[in-house]
UniProtKB/Swiss-Prot annotation:
The gene is Ednra. Interacts with HDAC7 and KAT5. The modification Phosphoserine is found at residue 424. Receptor for endothelin-1. Mediates its action by association with G proteins that activate a phosphatidylinositol-calcium second messenger system. The rank order of binding affinities for ET-A is: ET1 > ET2 >> ET3. It comes from Rattus norvegicus. This is Endothelin-1 receptor.
């Protein structure tokens, strides 16, 4: 609880400092620009904005430049504060929801199994993003500049911020793929029954997911630097992707397609493939001789499969608008078009919506589990309302993978014993 209070205090101080700094230094021009706001893990500085220019894109002496919009983009200050309120809500819900989800899986031994371990890994990645990246995003949006942009700590944040963003999304994507594979493996190996615990193969998968996510995020930490530039007679520094090598130039050129293909399409394709195979397995089992004996067994696993499928669908809905805006910027936007500034205003608005939806994905998974899974719903109610229920009853939760636990009210019978019958999910 002390840690949560510290994080909340840090968050409020950072946002408050951003509002004060914005009023003093950026009320004239920069308050309505969000060009250095990173809309996606690792997005470069000039993704949608064209007004604030890095040094190598400075205006020539005649004042003309391709891609430069003389007028401000049509994003009002009110919209920024609306976005800030949304981000604060996501911060609170995401921190409480993901922390509670981790606590549930950690404290209840019967919840420690393969799929729940992957869900815990997913929640931890979301929690890291919510706690570290969201405050920086809000500060940039309100202050119009990078936090601590004139000292070494700002340089450290410039490296850490895109690295953790990309790592968090990678952890989400790879965990969703692993959950899809796990559901197919559970249905295909219906006859294998194990005790409560995390299988070794699942532990290896989780470690591999985190290592691979960190490796794929290394180019972000290498490429992002603090770059000084001049805008309307004022000196500024911001964090942006500055390609200085051939590899980084190639990475910057193909980055949008790489993000769309690996970080969006791959989990959807993986889910489609393994859920199709899982459906075929279930249809074959319906005609088998053990249909009656396995009906309850398969029913429980189908419920878990629906939960995982729900998480994948939510991921797709949250991230599609942002990826769409990136692809439109890559394919439709033309620096030579006279109407490019109107298009940029539309893309910037679309990008704001995409940012909020993508960020919402970091807090919505615990909510989805609460409504989709009865087991997790009981756990959340017991954990969040423990003070209210402590004197009335002792809630015992059922793991996702089909364990059925019989329990009675502690006041009615203090000698109640629990019997657990676990169906393996792996």
């Amino acid at each position: 609880m002390g840690v949560l209070c510290f994080l909340a205090s840090f968050w409020l101080a950072l946002v408050g400092g951003a509002i004060a700094d914005n009023a003093e230094r950026y009320s004239a021009n920069l308050s309505s620009h969000v060009e250095d706001f990173t809309p996606f893990p690792g997005t470069e500085f000039n993704f949608l904005g064209t007004t604030l220019q890095p040094p190598n894109l400075a205006l020539p002496s005649n004042g003309s430049m391709h891609g430069y919009c003389p007028q401000q983009t049509k994003i009002t200050t009110a919209f920024k504060y609306i976005n800030t309120v949304i981000s604060c809500t996501i911060f609170i819900v995401g921190m409480v929801g993901n922390a509670t989800l981790l606590r549930i899986i950690y404290q209840n031994k019967c919840m420690r199994n393969g799929p729940n371990a992957l869900i815990a890994s997913l929640a931890l990645g979301d929690l890291i993003y919510v706690v570290i990246d969201l405050p920086i995003n809000v500060f940039k949006l309100l202050a119009g500049r990078w936090p601590f942009d004139h000292n070494d700590f700002g340089v450290f944040l410039c490296k850490l911020f895109p690295f953790l963003q990309k790592s968090s999304v990678g952890i989400t994507v790879l965990n969703l793929c692993a959950l899809s594979v796990d559901r197919y493996r559970a249905v295909a190996s219906w006859s294998r029954v194990q005790g409560i615990g995390i299988p070794l193969i699942t532990a290896i998968e989780i470690v591999s997911i985190w290592i691979l996510s960190f490796i794929l995020a290394i180019p972000e930490a290498i490429g992002f630097v603090m770059v000084p530039f001049e805008y309307k007679g004022e000196q500024h520094r911001t964090c942006m992707l500055n390609a200085t090598t051939k590899f980084m130039e190639f990475y910057q050129d193909v980055k949008d397609w790489w993000l769309f293909g690996f970080y969006f399409c791959m989990p959807l394709v993986c889910t489609a493939i393994f859920y199709t195979l899982m459906t075929c397995e279930m249809l074959n089992r319906r005609n088998g001789s053990l249909r009656i004996a396995l009906s309850e067994h398969l029913k429980q696993r189908r419920e878990v499969a629906k939960t995982v499928f729900c998480l994948v669908v939510i991921f797709a809905l949250c991230w599609f608008p942002l990826h769409l805006s990136r692809i439109l910027k890559k394919t439709v936007y033309d620096e030579m078009d006279k109407n490019r500034c109107e298009l940029l205003s539309f893309l910037l608005l679309m990008d704001y919506i995409g940012i909020n939806l993508a960020t919402m994905n970091s807090c919505i998974n615990p909510i989805a589990l609460y409504f989709v899974s009865k087991k997790f719903k009981n756990c959340f109610q017991s954990c969040l309302c423990c003070c209210c229920h402590q004197s009335k009853s002792l809630m015992t939760s059922v793991p996702m993978n089909g364990t059925s636990i019989q329990w009675k009210n502690q006041e009615q019978n203090h000698n109640t014993e629990r019997s657990s019958h676990k169906d393996s999910m792996n």
